[in-house]
Amino acid sequence: MNPNYLDFEQPIADLEAKIQELRNASAGPAVNVEAEVHALQDKLRLRTAQIFRNLTSWQVLQLARHPSRPYTADYLRVMFDEFQELAGDRAFADDKAIMGGLARINGRSVMVIGHQKGRDTKEKIKRNFGMPKPEGYRKALRLMKMAERFGLPVLTLIDTAGAWPGIDAESRGQSEAIARNLIEMAELKVPIICTVIGEGGSGGALALGVGDRTVMLEYAVYSTITPEGCASILWKDAGKAKDAAEQLGLTAPRLKSLGLVDKVVREPTGGAHRNPTQMAKRLKAVLLNELDALEKLSTEQLLEQRYTRLRSYGTYEAA
């Protein structure tokens, strides 16, 4: 099986392989297979739509974790006219699991901050698999405070399995760094738009996730814990991760129905990794629309709406 395909995509992989075989055969003399190719392409479109219309939460998670899925750096290249990365927390070190800096989007100056996982082994180690340490969150906060001083909107791109749980991170105040970001982001006097582009894992995601708008890509996930971790705690069996994924309600449509997400951005057929440029353009359009709306508000209106939004989380009506 092609490594770019997930297990539930095997029927799609088989059809695409048949189409390629026919195209290769048509290169020979007096061979015309266009009718067959068109028929298979129609079948491929229908089969793909059928599969992606009925995805389980576990399958959505596999898409969110796909190794070819666009990361923060990929969106920076396509969505922004300019980007100047800024490094370091001015206290301990520069955590490469968080990247951020000044950028322009359609000529508008913003501060962009996001998790970065890494593609190959070397980069994954450099980026710590996209799992930040305290210095990463403190770097993010430093950039947010800089944005506030200069009146720049903040855009965050969330994609992490969670904050780094190592002893080194704990000894430098991991929980305090995350909590500090939650407090400061709630009070930041500039617009904040948070977008979950892949995995939104626990406090490690939430430390970049407090804002005026929360956007999720169609096949992104957002939860308090990974399904594997949840299954290990609840049932003492990580093998029940598929069941945990269903119970966690981690998909974008489910979270939107609960009022935790404001907008879900549709992904290209097959997921963002099938057409990263198209995905970036769709997300860019959404972010520009949201920025237009938020920048019409006064600082007082912005903060009041943000507080109201945050206080609404978890409310329910008793039967």
Swiss-Prot record:
Q: What does this protein do?
A: Component of the acetyl coenzyme A carboxylase (ACC) complex. First, biotin carboxylase catalyzes the carboxylation of biotin on its carrier protein (BCCP) and then the CO(2) group is transferred by the carboxyltransferase to acetyl-CoA to form malonyl-CoA.
Which PROSITE patterns does UniProt cross-reference here? COA_CT_CTER
- Superkingdom in the source lineage: Bacteria
- What subunit structure does UniProt give? Acetyl-CoA carboxylase is a heterohexamer composed of biotin carboxyl carrier protein (AccB), biotin carboxylase (AccC) and two subunits each of ACCase subunit alpha (AccA) and ACCase subunit beta (AccD).
Per the database record, which ranges form the CoA carboxyltransferase C-terminal domain? 38-293
Q: In which pathway does it act?
A: Lipid metabolism; malonyl-CoA biosynthesis; malonyl-CoA from acetyl-CoA: step 1/1
Catalyses which reaction(s): N(6)-carboxybiotinyl-L-lysyl-[protein] + acetyl-CoA = N(6)-biotinyl-L-lysyl-[protein] + malonyl-CoA
Which Pfam families does its entry note?
A: ACCA
HAMAP family with a match to the protein in the record: AcetylCoA_CT_alpha
Q: What is its main location?
A: cytoplasm
- UniProt record, GO biological process: fatty acid biosynthetic process; malonyl-CoA biosynthetic process
Source organism of this protein record: Stenotrophomonas maltophilia (strain R551-3)
What's the name of the protein? Acetyl-coenzyme A carboxylase carboxyl transferase subunit alpha
Any single GO molecular-function term of the entry would be: carboxyl- or carbamoyltransferase activity
Q: Which InterPro entries match?
A: Acetyl_CoA_COase_a_su, ClpP/crotonase-like_dom_sf, COA_CT_C
- Record GO cellular component, one term: acetyl-CoA carboxylase complex
Q: Where in the cell is it found?
A: Cytoplasm
What are the alphabetically sorted keywords of the record? ATP-binding, Cytoplasm, Fatty acid biosynthesis, Fatty acid metabolism, Lipid biosynthesis, Lipid metabolism, Nucleotide-binding, Transferase
Q: What is its EC number?
A: 2.1.3.15
Q: Which family does it belong to?
A: Belongs to the AccA family.
Q: Where are the transmembrane segments?
A: none
